Amino acid sequence: MTDAEVAQITDNPYKADFPILAANPEVAYLDSAATSQRPRAVIEAQSSFYETMNANALRGLYRWSVEATAAIEGARASIAKFIGAVDKNGKPESQQIIFTRNTSEALNLVASSLGRYTLKPGDDVVISIMEHHSNIIPWQQICKATGANLVYLRMNSQYQITPEEIASKITERAKIVSVTHVSNVLGTRNDIKAIAKRAHTMGAYMVVDAAQSAPHIPIDVHDLDCDLLAFSAHKMCGPMGIGVLWGRAELLDAMPPFLTGGEMIDSVTETSAVWAPVPEKFEAGTQDAAGIYATGAAVEYLNGLDMAKIEKREELLARYLVQQLCTLDFVDIVGSKLGQNHVGAVAFNVRGVHPHDVSSILDMNNVYIRAGHHCAEPLLIELHESSTCRASVAFYNDKHDIDQLIEGLNQVWKIFGSAVSNK
């Protein structure tokens, strides 16, 4: 890296926006792949909802309820624009935004509703070996229920899914292809456009898990050419408990509801019900209006920073992180040793030391990382690892955070190194 590039990640104008980071300058928070921190604007938005318009949205004609409804619909429009879900005139395709609790629920919705609508015995559902459990288990279950086959796209030695692998696994038997945009363990960015092109050529639907991409890179659902895309607010500076599912209008119209109950119907008799139109059809019961409002605030905050600038800064942070880890001869990177191949996350191990021990000692040094299988056990089995350490960066990190991690890892080796060497 050049001195100018290092200077860009030394300067940090962002931490002041985050109360928990500003109040704890001694902490190097490197676990944003698990959950991001929240800026003051988001915290204040959620609080202001309860202070100024707390009412059940969609269910009242009085002012607070009307304002709560407007808050939800305003957030829906902001989120649509954030992921490029706009028509040719630039109008947000708000009705194609469905609120769930998280990405996991959104993917369960897709597997259940689209799976029931689409799959029959002998069909293929194609996913990748690098999926989070949330994009594996729902498909395992629906394949068992329908008699469909679950097929895995596998990586090459560079931790990439090759065009040849895409062509060989996505065949005319494929009916649904569901792939993560970015691996939550390796940080690998998959070529969604190429996978979607093959899926559509074979007559399959394309589903994208964008939980690890939406916080870090610009998203345009039309450019990706996907049919459904899911992500979580809490990984992109929003509150916990809010997920988002976008889908093509005609597909959402055709899919049956996932959950049933209040507000997702047009009419009910003693023996039947008529579903409400999308998105209400998929939003049974009372929504977390305050959380949705705060998610809208998170999107506006990120838009104000410019996602292209966030992507560039985080690329520099990932490159510096990989570069510094490579200076430690007792650390093995799990994944690519090219920093530019990592979006957000870098997995590694300290030779001979369990990741939980590494994480515990780093915690004593005010460095917060993740240790374990990261809800991606099939991937770790493929990599012949039982668990790894994972450091994940966000735009509010800086060079000092990574330097603090390296100092902490040296402390880990100081404690364990001699015992490991004598084994």
Predicted features, each with a name:
Residues M1-K423:
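Pyridoxal 5′-phosphate
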